[in-house]
Design a protein with these regions (language model features):
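Bacterial N-terminal signal peptides
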Residues: 7-17
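Short alpha-helix in the alpha/beta-hydrolase fold that links the catalytic acid
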Residues: 74, 198-209, 221
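Primarily recognizes the serine-hydrolase "nucleophile elbow" in alpha/beta-hydrolase
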Residues: 121-182
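Short, proline-enriched alpha-helix->beta-strand connector loops that line the catalytic pocket
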Residues: 181-186, 212-215
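Short beta-strand/loop motif that positions the catalytic acidic residue
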Residues: 188-190
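Acidic catalytic loop of the alpha/beta-hydrolase fold
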Residues: 193-197, 226
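C-terminal catalytic histidine-bearing segment of alpha/beta-hydrolase fold enzymes
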Residues: 210, 215-267
């Protein structure tokens, strides 16, 4: 009897035009190859197949290690929140660094060539906007470490994004801010004890954003250091003797703040 009541209720709602929302998720993911400046880029797309309507798209830019399992997992986490997430390949050919020396080489080469950064970011953005599940007018970006610096630079140079979020991003790599050109709202999550971001770099970027009238938030987590959102940070820190460490509290709190931030962007 109870089952029959549920069936009749669903039929009634469908007949009256009321949308029926299912709590069941079906996260699908796939690799997407594209080109930027003649280089093959290997992106990664994730979304909930059971959501029928178009939804916001989020670009996810990797740490200095490259587009690895960690960053693809973040894309899947965003898909579970109802977004279409596209993990960007900034290095090309899906290159992954296994050692900090390689990571430094890959990231520094791009940091010195912002035109290539813009080209690769823009091509990934175009791929995301064209996905049939995506509302092309609702695009944001998040980035980690090296990727945090990338999304900040793109936003501060006037990229057409609703918002960007930087997690333990490279704040010292930020270029000049174009006053009046910034369209995106910005949120920065930083570890208070992050050795990779100096006090001067933090003060400099905040001063630049204030002077340019940027809508931004800066959140600092006590006792958190670089890579605080990455559960593998402890392993990397010990293996290579570099100041990286996972901080579960900062990870949880920053992700919660991100969810609120994204909801505010697209409401």
């Amino acid at each position: 009897m109870k089952k029959m009541f549920v069936i009749l209720t669903v039929i009634f709602l469908m007949m009256t035009g009321v949308s029926v929302v299912t709590a069941e998720q079906k996260i699908v993911d796939r690799h997407v190859n594209y080109t930027a400046g003649g280089v093959t880029m290997k992106g990664y797309l994730a979304y909930d197949q059971n959501i029928m309507k178009k939804r916001p798209g989020i670009l996810v830019v990797h740490e200095w290690w490259g587009q690895n399992d960690y960053i693809r997992n973040r894309a899947r986490m965003l898909a579970k929140l109802g977004y279409v997430a596209f993990a960007v390949d900034m290095y090309g050919d899906g290159k992954i660094a296994e050692h900090p020396k390689d990571a430094t080489l890959f990231s520094s080469q791009l940091s010195k060539d912002f035109d290539t950064v813009k080209l690769r970011f823009k091509e990934a953005e175009n791929i995301l906007r064209k996905q049939p599940q995506v509302d092309p007018d609702k695009i944001a970006a998040i980035g980690y470490c090296f990727g945090g610096g990338v999304v900040l630079n793109m936003a501060l140079q006037g990229a057409d994004l609703r918002g960007v979020a930087s997690f333990h991003g490279s704040l010292g790599a930020v270029k000049e801010v174009k006053a009046g050109a910034v369209k995106a709202r910005i949120i920065i999550f930083n570890g208070e004890d992050d050795k990779f971001n100096s006090k001067e770099a933090i003060e400099s970027i905040q001063e630049k954003m204030k002077n340019a009238g940027v809508d931004y938030q800066f959140i600092s987590y006590p006792e958190a250091i670089h890579a605080f959102t990455n559960p593998d940070a402890d392993k990397y820190g010990k293996k290579f003797n570099i100041p990286l460490a996972y901080n579960a509290r900062a990870d949880k709190e920053s992700w919660k703040a991100l969810k609120i931030f994204l909801e505010g962007l697209f409401k």
